[in-house]
Amino acid sequence: MPKPVLVIGGGIAGIQAALDLADQGIQVYLVEKTPSIGGKMMQLDKTFPTLDCSACILTPKMVAVARHPNIKLLTYSEVIEVTGSAGNFNVKILKKPRYVDEEKCIGCGICFNKCPSKVPDEFNLGMSQRRAIYVPFPQAVPLKATIDKEHCIYFTKQRCRVCEKVCPTKAINYEQKPETIELNVASIVVATGYQLIDPTLAAQYGYGKYQNVYISLEFERLLSSTGPTGGEIVRRSDNKHPKNIAFIQCVCSRDVKINPNCSAFCCMASVKHSILAKEHLPNVDCTIFYMDLRAFGKGYQEFYNRAMREFGVKFMRGKPAKIEEEPETKNLIITYEDTFTGLKKTMTFDMVVLAVGVKPIYPEALKLPLSEDGYVQLKNQYLDPVLTMIDGVYTVGVAAGAKDIPDSVVQSGNAAIKASILAGGAQK
């Protein structure tokens, strides 16, 4: 009988690792700190270079995780302590209270349609609102409501309780307490993903100051039919379609003052955004400002060529120095140096999208050594890029270095094989 394996992180990398392990007959505990699995990929409209629907790829895998007999899903939970060694890790997990009985909740949505408390929606990066009781997105797994205690009127003012009154299954439980779960596992797969670097650190671009400056993930949500505008690209300032859009690369990346690392997927993400913008608005002009364009993956160079030749996307080699706003029109004036001519130039755009760099998230409870670049230290990043400095702990996805979805999924399979060996091997 194989021993269990712990997977930390419910994004695409963690999901794939969990499925690969579970299909070998190994019991998997998949821990995700948010109310639903899915991760950043769930926020994407389409994937590059094929422009396949992101949710169409991911949601079947999310459902497969929930239904797999060998996977125990622990959402809204965090690993708080790890002791022991390879083959015999003792793990403590804190399961936070949803204040909703998961066994009773049927995900009907009546509670959050009636809730009077409105909060900026994290899934849409604050561009829309959710209620104090909510599910993160319609395809959430598990499709169970969660009460945001900090914004719930009952918890903050001791009144309301509307959700309790309207719930048809009596699932609301304001007395729910945190729960500590203790596990013994053979190995651990770290798939904790990344967070975006604060774009206001690049103050010269005016993010948060100028309404029509967006970050790439915000633009992704604008493109999505499930996003705050229903898939319509409109400006924050006047709700009008932009006539021209600038995409600026390497914001908070390859910058010695903020983050010297390349974030790997930003170049192709911006190429994708420019193509999708042209599909949504055929007459829009798209210009990508870049230092070096890195099209290293399968089909990436062809994707870049397609953007230029088929869609007429312009590529301007030169990193903008600053952005200024025209007060009346809210248009944005970009000052940059054209590195091919050496001339200082300005261009005016209706909308600017910043390709912001990323930094890893890693579980502090594991006390994993970090490399100089801030990612999890690997034993040998060239020969085996999943082995950490702690035997029995493997890392996949962006936790060990910035990478795209295909590379993350490949790593997950690698880590699953190694984790299964410590667990006792595949069982039918």
Predicted regions and their residues:
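Residues forming the flavin
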Residues: 1-428
